[in-house]
Structures are given as structure tokens and as C-alpha cells.
A protein has these predicted regions:
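Cleavable N-terminal signal peptides
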Residues: 13-14, 24, 36
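N-terminal segment of the mature folded domain
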Residues: 27-155, 295-298, 335
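Short beta-strand->loop
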Residues: 33-35, 126-128, 146-173, 188-191, ...
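Periplasmic-binding protein-like
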Residues: 116-120, 182-188, 195-196, 228-261, ...
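Short helix-loop capping/hinge motifs at secondary-structure junctions, enriched
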Residues: 129-135, 154, 167-175, 254-262
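Ligand-binding pocket segment of bilobal, Venus flytrap-like solute-binding proteins
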Residues: 172-239
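Extracellular/periplasmic juxtamembrane helices and adjacent flexible linkers that interface
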Residues: 255-341
Length: 341
């Protein structure tokens, strides 16, 4: 089996796992707690960083990985998971870790681009030939269309999905929040199951054959074409989407206790180097420094109108998180779980 198919199969057994790896021969071991669909990216980055660190310092470093829905991962770190670094799906999740006292409040200003070494967006993955003729967000609200997306309570990607749909509705209905809510309610009425993370939703759609369209991270959609077959799926780019900015941070409490700050900071800084930026683009993420990427990797990214979380429509994560995703927020108001009877 190819690597992506193997990852999907493994996810069915364990939705949250650390890569099994002995640190017996490592001078330093770091734990990178990341969001769901970054496995392939960080496998490549970790190998490159370990090689560079060895050449620079003579020391051996081992980076272990943990993956799951971004919100779930943030909660694990808040509850005591000893992560040296987090590479999560959105600022709001790292802010929650900072509020718990495990990260210094200034974390987002330590690295370039608000500590986001790459960006992504949300696209649609449909079955080959696009049998339901899905072209844009309003097609997702039609009768007879099944939409696969994760749970925004646990998944960062799911929150980006929701906000992209909200931005489309707001543009369509002229900033009428009640109509925006109704649009989102209709969309989620077409969702048969909410997985906890993005990779789980990919499994549901691609492996289990459920649904007509998957709301996917752009990188996850390209990876599905590459690993599961371009003869099985098509990518549809909507007229408008969201500028997803996944940030990274050192867990100050952990690195100071373990004495791993120097290597942990070097690891995150490495993400901004030309070598890592090239790997980022090759793994289907949009690099913060496009000049470092291969042109053939950049060519796959569609030119699409992207709305920022800092747009007045959302007002940043400090406003968007409680308004839309907190207990009793808009998502709770509009979503009715499917009956299991």
C-alpha cells in the first residue's frame, strides 16, 4: 500500500498517535504536536532538519509527531501533553494554550508572518466527473447533495471550512447575518457525519465512499489525487475561499523544563528557510516565500479570492471563536446532529 492509503487505514485504528520511534540514540528528542493532515509534510521537514542540525552542531535530534484535530490537540497540550512545539491549524488553538499558561502571550510575534510559515485554503474534492455538478458553495445546500466536513468543535480545518462558507454567504446575501445563518444551517443539514479531524473526513469520503463532496484543505485534496488516484476524484475551486494561516509555536513551559529551547526554536526557524519552503510547496502548501519553491509546485495553486480571518466580517480569532464555535455559539444554534435511529 502506498503511504497515504496506509495513513488513512491507521487513522481508523487510532485518531491520535505519536509516531513510534526510539530516542535511545538521540542527543535530543522533540515532540511536535500538529494538526491532522500534516503527516507527510513534517515527515519530510523532520528528516531535512535533523540532517542540517547534525551538520551544524554534531548533535543528533529526533522529532516525534502527534497528529489529530487541531482543537483536540490543543486541549491535549493544555491538559499536560509534553509538546516541545505545536504546529496547529489556527491561531485560536494556540491562544488557548497561551491562556493556560504554557506559552508566553507574545508567541505570535516571535516569527515572521505572525508565526505562520505557510498558508493554505479550502477547496472541494468531488468524485470523478463531478456527477452532482458542484461548482460553488451554494451547490452544497441543494437537496440530494451529501457534504463531508469534520467537526468544528475538534478540527481546525473544519473551522476554516465553516468560515469560508460563511464568507461566501455574506457576500451573496449582502451582509445579512440571518440569511448567512440560514445558509450555513442548510449546508450542515447535508452533512451525514462529522469526523473529529480532516484526515478522518478524507477517510470517510475517499475510503468509505460516503458523500458527494469533501470540504478539504487544499493540500489534502492534492494529496488525495496523488495517492488515491486522479482517475477517482476531481478538485473544484470555489469562487471564494478563506486564507488559512496555520501557525507554529514553542511550548515555553516544556522547553525550559527539558532544556530543549535552542533546538526547538531552531526547528521552527528552519520552516522559513529556502530548503523547508521548497518542501512545503512540494507537499501542497502555499509557502510564505514562493521564490524558494519549484515553479511546477507553485503552478498547481489556483488564483482564488481569499478572505482573511482578520477581515471585519470575522474580526480575528478572538471574536470569531466565541461567536461561532463556543458552546452555545452560532454553530451550536444551527447544527442538528443526524438521528442514529
Amino acid at each position: 500500500m502506498r503511504r497515504f492509503r496506509s495513513t488513512l487505514a491507521a487513522l481508523a485504528v487510532a485518531g491520535f498517535a505519536t509516531l513510534a520511534a526510539s530516542a535511545a540514540f538521540a542527543d535530543t528528542t522533540l515532540l511536535n504536536v500538529s494538526y491532522d493532515p500534516t503527516r507527510e509534510l513534517y515527515k519530510a521537514v523532520n528528516e531535512a532538519f535533523a540532517k542540517e542540525w547534525k551538520a551544524k552542531t554534531g548533535d543528533t535530534v529526533k522529532i516525534e509527531q502527534s497528529h489529530g484535530g487541531s482543537g483536540k490537540q490543543a486541549r491535549a497540550v493544555i491538559d499536560g501533553l509534553q509538546a516541545d512545539v505545536v504546529t496547529l491549524a489556527l491561531q485560536g488553538d494556540i491562544d488557548q494554550i497561551a491562556k493556560a499558561g504554557r506559552i508566553n502571550p507574545d508567541w505570535q510575534h516571535r516569527l515572521a508572518n505572525n508565526s505562520s510559515p505557510y498558508t493554505s485554503t479550502i477547496v472541494f474534492l468531488v468524485r470523478k466527473g463531478n456527477p452532482k455538478a458542484i461548482k460553488d458553495w451554494d451547490d452544497l445546500t441543494k437537496d440530494g447533495v451529501e457534504v463531508i466536513t469534520p467537526n468544528p468543535k475538534t478540527s481546525g480545518g473544519a473551522r476554516w471550512n465553516y468560515l469560508a462558507a460563511w464568507a461566501f454567504a455574506d457576500q451573496k446575501f449582502g451582509h445579512d447575518e440571518e440569511k448567512d445563518k440560514d445558509f450555513i444551517k442548510k449546508l450542515y443539514a447535508n452533512v451525514p457525519v462529522l469526523d473529529t479531524g480532516a484526515r478522518g473526513s478524507t477517510t470517510t469520503f475517499a475510503q468509505r465512499g460516503i458523500g458527494d463532496v469533501l470540504l478539504a484543505w487544499e493540500n489534502e485534496a492534492f494529496l488525495a489525487l496523488d495517492e488515491l488516484g486522479a482517475d477517482k476524484f476531481d478538485i473544484v475551486v470555489p469562487s471564494l475561499s478563506i486564507k488559512a494561516e496555520p501557525p507554529v509555536a514553542v511550548i515555553d513551559e516544556v522547553v525550559d523544563a527539558k532544556g530543549t529551547r535552542k533546538v526547538a526554536e531552531a526547528y521552527l526557524n528552519f520552516l522559513y528557510t529556502p530548503e523547508a519552503q521548497k518542501l512545503i510547496a512540494h507537499n501542497y502548501y502555499r509557502p510564505s516565500d514562493p521564490k524558494s519553491a519549484d515553479l511546477k509546485d507553485l503552478a498547481r495553486f489556483a488564483d482564488v479570492k481569499l478572505v482573511s480571518i482578520d477581515d471585519p466580517l470575522f474580526g480575528g480569532w478572538a471574536k470569531a471563536q466565541p461567536k461561532h464555535f463556543a458552546d452555545g455559539g452560532i454553530f451550536d444554534q444551527i447544527y442538528q446532529p443526524k438521528s442514529t435511529n
